[in-house]
């Protein structure tokens, strides 16, 4: 009987400590979201992007960059505050009316090789999501606090990815690469 009581008390203490840790993690994530919202509100107008909270995922901010581009029609910017103490950028270029999808382009293997080379050359990395859509990305860890200045640098760098869309054109639709 005494062992049962000790076991129940142990499980109760363990449950309370786990739920307390989860609450602290959620509070930290909410605080990071608020800091990011304030930064995006200040920085967005300077890069011609109005950010808003996603209706589907409340820890995501979304915005569209469409000014100052020569190759992409726009860049759809998704910024996520994750439960794992990171902030992730996924920037989806729109070209010819939609996403660039490796399964639907003229030369998928060639585009994939180019994406790998561009990841080596550029500041932001290139990737493909689970549906095959091409994106540009960056991930911050929050171990040392909120990286306000670094986030500003990434936001200002997004427009520079437009030149890479020009390099992708032969693989996307067979047109000439932008000069």
Feature roles, as predicted:
Residues 57-60, 86-87, 132-134:
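Hydrophobic residues embedded in beta-strands of well-ordered beta-sheets
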Residues 3, 21-74:
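Charge-rich, low-complexity N-terminal segments
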Residues 7-17:
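Bacterial N-terminal signal peptides
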Residues 24-27, 96-104, 140-154:
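Second-shell loop/turn segments in exported
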Residues 27, 42, 90-134:
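Short, internal acidic amphipathic alpha-helical interface segments
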Residues 116-166:
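A short, solvent-exposed beta-edge/loop patch
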């Amino acid at each position: 009987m005494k062992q049962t009581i000790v076991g129940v008390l142990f499980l109760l203490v363990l449950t309370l400590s786990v739920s307390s840790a989860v609450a602290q993690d959620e509070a930290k994530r909410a605080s990071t979201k608020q800091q990011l919202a304030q930064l995006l509100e200040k920085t967005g107008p300077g890069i011609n992007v109005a950010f808003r909270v996603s209706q589907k995922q409340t820890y995501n901010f979304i915005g569209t960059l469409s000014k100052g581009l020569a190759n992409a029609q726009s860049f759809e910017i998704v910024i996520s505050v994750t439960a794992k103490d990171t902030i992730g950028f996924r920037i989806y270029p729109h070209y010819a009316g939609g996403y660039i999808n490796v399964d639907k382009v003229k030369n998928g293997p060639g585009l994939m090789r180019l994406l790998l080379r561009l990841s080596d050359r550029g500041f932001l990395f290139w990737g493909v999501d689970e549906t095959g859509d091409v994106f540009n990305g960056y991930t911050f860890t929050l171990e040392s606090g909120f990286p306000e200045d670094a986030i500003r640098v990434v936001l200002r760098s997004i427009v520079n990815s437009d030149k890479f869309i020009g390099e992708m054109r032969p693989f996307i639709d067979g047109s000439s690469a932008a000069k």
